[in-house]
Amino acid sequence: MAGHSKWANIQHRKGKQDKLRSKMFSKLAKEITVAAKMGDPDPDKNPRLRLAVKAAKAVSMPKDVIERAIKKSQGGDAEDYSEIRYEGYGPNGIAIIVETMTDNVNRTASNVRSYFTKYGGNLGTTGSVSFMFDRVGEITYKPAAGDADTVMMAAIEAGADDVESDEEGHWIYCGDTSLNEVSEALEKVLGESEEAKLVWKPQNRTNVDLETAQKLMKLIDALEEDDDVQTVTGNFDIPEDVAAKLDA
């Protein structure tokens, strides 16, 4: 599968999202604050903020926490964050992109490098792996939104480029600059999406064995547990039989 990755679902099944819930909230709040500070504090007038708020609602972040994050952006004490992308290779040459938002670039660079080194990878330079990914918009719907044909037709009408559907849902892809436009068009036909965000979509994925999957999960867990890291993306997939052993 070229786009949607099953390992995200594996993380859900392992209960990882519950463990990282508070950390996830703080990262989403940071994105909301930065988006609001860079543009208008009204989500309807600020596409990036609208997506950030949508992502927060998707994981049931309380409304007052969202509003507090927006309000923080308008105060003089809002931190200045730098958005830095790191690229490297994990175990067995799997390409990994790490997006960070930090108030201390030296600290973040040192930490990210140490995670790669500790878990069998190596940090590269900017551009060393991103050419193997496409920067696109990803809009997610649950299976109840409709069958594959219905969603495909709606996506084409909305201006999307690609759709992937399976028993777990629908993933609709579009150009990175047209995410809000396509998302709004889809909502008129399919209702509100579960999630809409910019992602790094691998052009190709490598199926990994159990040993590699275990090593990759350790690296990804370490990265995602760092407060400065916002997203981690790899060009791999975990076959169902390997996933079952990971869950065991």
From Swiss-Prot:
GO CC field: cytosol
Keywords noted in UniProt: Cytoplasm, DNA-binding, Transcription, Transcription regulation
GO MF annotations in UniProt: DNA binding
SUPFAM superfamilies associated with the record: YebC-like
Naturally occurring in which organism (per UniProt): Cereibacter sphaeroides (strain ATCC 17023 / DSM 158 / JCM 6121 / CCUG 31486 / LMG 2827 / NBRC 12203 / NCIMB 8253 / ATH 2.4.1.) (Rhodobacter sphaeroides)
Recorded family membership: Belongs to the TACO1 family.
Protein name from the UniProt record: Probable transcriptional regulatory protein RHOS4_22610
Domain of life: Bacteria
